[in-house]
Curated annotation (Swiss-Prot):
Position of the signal peptide: none
Keywords: Methyltransferase, Transferase
Keyword set includes Methyltransferase: yes
PANTHER family: 2-METHOXY-6-POLYPRENYL-1,4-BENZOQUINOL METHYLASE, MITOCHONDRIAL, METHYLTRANSFERASE
Organism, scientific name: Mycobacterium sp. (strain JLS)
Protein name: Uncharacterized methyltransferase Mjls_0208
GO annotation, biological process: methylation
InterPro entries xrefs: Methyltransf_11, SAM-dependent_MTases_sf
Length: 252
């Protein structure tokens, strides 16, 4: 069974439309947005695990690199998985469930994870790689801490895709620095995802090239696309503009 066989059945047009409709709440109602994203992500990881390992995901440890406020914890717990969140920014950790008692969270950088080699079953990073200056150092750390036969799942926003500019909208096509300056003039403050400091241009090509170099890549697909549109990820050039978010699945 291929790693994506089960998830491909879930990757319908209805799912894509449902997730797209939630994106408008990212800034105004983060609990709603991230709650929906968390449920979808946990289902995706569970499907990938079951297909790749032919075992159930219950009882497996998930290390969420860049877990932020911790909205993903409950979604993984509902699937019987042991969740550990990693977040370097204390402001993010205190903005949601991560601040509640009983959670398992570690304050650390994704590019220098304080975990032993091969110590977790699944290492996940969702929409974080585009926010660090060296995303493949983060990726290498994820592979390092994942046990042999486990899964490292790295999902990130492609810069030239329609959501590459985050809250700056499509103005990122004018250039990242220019888009950030335009946002600042309009809103009176710098964007949270500020080009060059907290947002960087990460391409689909570079992600695929890095993943192939590890020798552990077993799947790559557009995260939010319906299955019938996954072919776009195989077309150089086109994928940079139409693959809004790329998922790289690695099995050390």
């Amino acid at each position: 069974m291929s790693a994506t066989e089960l998830f491909a059945r879930r990757a319908t047009l209805a799912r894509s439309v449902r997730l797209l409709s939630e994106f408008r709440f990212e800034q105004s109602d983060p609990a709603r947005f991230y709650g929906a994203l968390a449920d979808d992500t946990a289902a995706m990881v569970a499907d990938l695990w079951q297909a790749a390992t032919e075992t159930t995901p219950g009882g497996r440890t998930v290390l969420d690199v860049g877990g932020g406020p911790g909205f993903f914890a409950a979604a993984f717990a509902r699937r019987g998985m042991e969740y550990v969140g990693v977040e370097p920014d204390p402001r993010e950790m205190h903005a949601g469930p991560a601040a509640q008692a009983g959670g398992r969270y570690v304050r650390a950088s994704g590019t220098s994870l304080p975990f032993a080699d091969g110590s977790v079953d699944v290492c996940l990073s969702s929409n974080v790689a585009e926010h660090v200056p060296d995303p493949w150092r983060l990726g290498n750390e994820m592979v390092r801490v994942t046990r042999p036969g486990g899964l490292a799942v790295l999902s990130y926003t492609v810069w030239l895709g329609p959501f590459g500019g985050h809250e700056m909208g499509l103005t990122h096509y004018l250039g990242g620095a220019r888009a950030a300056d335009r946002y600042t003039r309009k809103h009176g403050h710098r964007p949270k995802n500020d080009y060059g400091s907290s947002l960087f241009a990460v391409s689909a090509h570079d992600g695929l090239e890095w993943a192939a170099s590890t020798g552990a890549l077993i799947a790559a697909f557009p995260r939010y696309h319906p299955r019938w549109a996954w072919w776009t990820n195989a077309v150089p050039g086109l994928r940079e503009f139409v693959v809004s978010n790329q998922v790289l699945v690695l099995q050390p």
